[in-house]
């Protein structure tokens, strides 16, 4: 059902432009530079969630490195959940209720 809805959505499935890639690469470069961070609330709750089979996180080591980067910037209240047997769209996976419950618990 999700795939069908995606295929029918006029805003999905478009061809990413050269400018789109350029801006994405600029964003990725700047997001991992400490000088771009000003921590106003070191206790801000940050919740990292991902599926263990998500190619975007590369691997668990790289995923943990992202969290360590934010800690090195000064954030101290970082928690995370890596969902086994899930891919990129964890909110559309078979066990999505677990993910939603974890997000709800984090927000309480």
Question: Language-model features: where?
Answer:
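Short, histidine-centered active-site or binding-site loop motifs used for metal coordination
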Residues: 10, 50-52, 84-87
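Residues at alpha-helix caps and immediate loop-helix transition turns in enzyme cores, especially N-
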Residues: 20, 59-63, 95-99
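Conserved loop-alpha-helix segment in the C-terminal half of the alpha/beta-hydrolase fold
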Residues: 46-47, 52-79
